[in-house]
Regions:
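Substrate-binding/active-site clefts of carbohydrate-active enzymes
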Residues: 26-89, 96-174
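Generic structural hydrophobic/aromatic packing signal, biased to beta-strands
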Residues: 3-5, 93, 110
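Short, flexible turn/loop "capping" segments at secondary-structure junctions
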Residues: 14-15, 102
């Protein structure tokens, strides 16, 4: 089944009409900083860029998406001349905030770039450099939900004693 909701009077904004968007899954795009340390012990680095991603369920039947191929913000920055040459107008980035899966749709901290991708300053630099090439950056911001392994819920205890799961007085608990 399908639900389609739209405004019949909607018009594409002039600023993006006819523009070319290029979607990037940061971890798989380009590794700009090689041999970076893994910031969390449960992450697995795939040095072989042609290796098959882990897709089989683990011993308890879960799919953790914990294998990483090393793509990062500096890698995207390195490819800006190439992307410009291709004629793109916008880069649409899959989630970049700290998370504990390679797809990062289970955000753990909305205030910080995932350390495997770089720093907040690296993101600012990427945006400034992209602008020099006439390329805009659009974030896939998943602000409607977060992961249970996050500073907000903290089910795994990775973020100390705070979080709605561990602290009845948490500001994130309703």
């Amino acid at each position: 089944w399908q639900i389609t909701v739209y405004d019949a009077a909607f018009e594409t904004p002039a600023s993006i009409k006819g523009k070319v968007f290029y979607q990037i899954f940061p971890d798989r795009f380009c590794e700009g900083v090689e041999n970076k340390p893994m910031p969390f012990p449960d992450r697995i680095y795939q040095a072989d860029k042609h290796a098959e991603p882990f897709w089989q369920p683990n011993e308890v039947g879960g799919h953790l998406n914990e294998d990483y191929f090393g793509g990062d913000l500096k890698g995207i920055q390195l490819k800006l001349p190439y992307l410009h040459q291709m004629g793109i107008d916008f880069i649409y980035l899959n989630p970049i905030f700290e998370a504990h899966s390679n797809h990062r749709y289970n955000t753990a901290d909305y205030l910080n770039v995932d350390p495997l991708l770089g720093t907040n300053e690296d993101f600012e630099t990427l945006c400034a450099e992209a602008k020099r090439y006439g390329i805009g950056i659009v974030l896939d911001g998943v602000f409607s939900h977060t992961g249970s392994d996050s500073r907000y819920f903290n089910r795994e205890g990775r973020y100390g004693e705070g979080g709605a799961y561990r602290d009845p007085n948490s500001p994130y608990r309703s």
